[in-house]
């Protein structure tokens, strides 16, 4: 029996999902700023997708499933962007947090690190943390 690579294992566990529009929910008093600040970070979703594309355009190790995992993650970024924009449509945005997120985005775009490293850091430090809230 052939053992799956770590990338193939991850791909085999993924479930297809489709973002759906949401209605405005109740927000706990005092959490509005945190909600709006987290939603502002949605501006990083499609750049993460682009970082993955830049990584795909470079030479990569020939590990089975690596390329497929990166392509699958790109689709996830599109879905995350759509889902977060549904929440924005329901709850609205606040310009000061939108500006803050764009400032953070500029810093990430200017960072010299490998694009896949940038994508991995953003996924683990930002999106793995905030997406469960939405």
Task: Specify the residue positions occupied by each region the protein language model found.
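Non-heme di-metal
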Residues: 1-134
């Amino acid at each position: 029996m052939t053992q799956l690579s770590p990338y193939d294992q991850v791909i085999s566990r993924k479930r297809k999902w489709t973002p759906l529009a949401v209605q405005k929910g109740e927000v706990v008093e005092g959490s509005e700023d945190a909600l709006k600040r987290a939603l502002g970070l949605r501006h990083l979703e499609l750049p993460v997708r682009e970082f993955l594309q830049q990584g795909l355009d470079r030479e990569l190790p020939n590990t089975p499933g690596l390329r497929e995992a990166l392509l699958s993650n790109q689709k996830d970024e599109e879905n995350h962007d759509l889902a977060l924009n549904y929440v924005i449509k329901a709850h609205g945005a606040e310009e000061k947090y939108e500006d803050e997120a764009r400032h953070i985005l500029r810093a990430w775009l200017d960072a010299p690190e490998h694009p896949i490293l940038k994508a991995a850091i953003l996924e683990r430090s930002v999106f793995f943390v905030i997406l469960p809230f939405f």
